[in-house]
Design a protein with these regions (language model features):
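C-terminal leucine-rich, beta-strand-based interaction scaffolds used for sensing/assembly
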Residues: 172-259
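Conserved NTP-binding/hydrolysis module of P-loop NTPases
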Residues: 9-44
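Conserved P-loop NTPase "ATPase switch" module shared by AAA+ and STAND
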Residues: 67-92
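Substrate-engagement module of ASCE P-loop NTPases
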Residues: 60-64, 93-114
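Structural recognition of the conserved hydrophobic beta-strand(s) that form the central parallel beta-sheet
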Residues: 14, 72-76, 97-101, 114-121
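Short glycine-rich substrate-engagement loop in P-loop NTPases that contacts/grips substrate
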Residues: 27, 43-61
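Amphipathic alpha-helical segments of the small helical/lid subdomains adjacent to P-loop NTPase cores
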Residues: 128-131, 139-207
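Short, small-residue-biased leader/transition segments that mark boundaries at the very start
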Residues: 1-4
């Protein structure tokens, strides 16, 4: 077991693209510039760096030089600007160019980067925003990371046992009955063939907090891009009930395909 004193701090660059509304090129630039300005206030700025790519490249290097530690880069919803503009090919292409310029730093400054994690709800082809990169690994369906985005059975039984006991008492159930009900409603997610199953963390934690068995996943909202895609394809939703796809098919999906 590693002690907290054994861990080494490193500069962290966190970019959240989830909250923006990207109706123009400027709206994306404003979001990126706001993040870059905050980072530059801590690690310094260079006037000659006049676009988001150069500024990001420069601040990553300066963070390493100032701290002596390679940086961590975290991007939430890396694909949000493109997904908001499905159907607007012209704007989408402009936004893609900006994102490609920004994300290219992940390759050019690789020697200064210790770790990077980009999350999103879609998968883009190599010909999209990451076309210049060959150092990214898609771990969406990777067994080594299959439990990363959920709560395992072991974690539920150990760290969350007191909350389960409280929920059981509140609902007039035994501890085992409560576990069975939680498993029935919120378990069953697998991110690789024969991998460990995980519980939906949003639903499970809300159930334990509220001590009620509800369909909490509805509260996460429906991705607007999914609604738009369904409108464009006239797909019958009832066909999805028993639809199965191979992992190869999932890995070939490009959510912003123009056709």
């Amino acid at each position: 077991t590693r002690r907290s004193s054994d861990l080494t701090e490193c500069p962290v660059f966190h970019l959240d693209l989830n909250t923006g509304k990207y109706e123009s090129v400027q709206s994306l630039l404003d979001t990126l510039n706001e993040a870059l300005t905050a980072w530059e206030q801590e690690y310094g700025a260079v006037e000659a760096e006049r676009n988001v790519g150069l500024r990001f490249k420069g601040v990553v290097q300066r963070a390493y030089e100032k701290t002596g530690q390679r940086v961590a880069i975290l991007v939430d919803e890396y694909d949000k600007p493109l997904l908001q503009n499905i159907g607007n090919n012209e704007l989408q292409e402009e936004l893609r160019g900006i994102l490609r310029l920004f994300y290219s730093v992940l390759k050019t400054q690789d020697r200064y980067i210790k770790f990077g994690l980009l999350t999103g709800v879609s998968k883009f082809s190599k010909l999209s925003v990451f076309s210049d990169l060959n150092n990214l690994e898609d771990i969406s369906l990777n067994r080594n990371w299959a439990s990363l985005c959920g709560i395992t059975e072991e974690e539920l039984h150990s760290g969350l046992k007191p909350a389960v006991e409280e929920m059981a008492e509140s609902n007039g159930l035994t501890y085992e009955e409560t576990l069975d009900r939680l498993k029935e409603m919120y378990d069953g997610y697998h991110f690789d063939r024969d991998s460990i199953g995980v519980y939906n963390p949003f639903s499970l934690l809300n159930a334990l907090k509220n001590k009620q068995f509800n369909d909490y996943w509805f509260e996460t909202g429906t991705p607007s891009f999914l609604v738009e895609m369904l409108k464009r394809t006239n797909y019958e939703l009832n066909h999805l009930a028993h639809e199965e796809q191979t992992s190869d098919m999932l890995n070939s999906i490009d959510s912003v395909h123009r056709n």
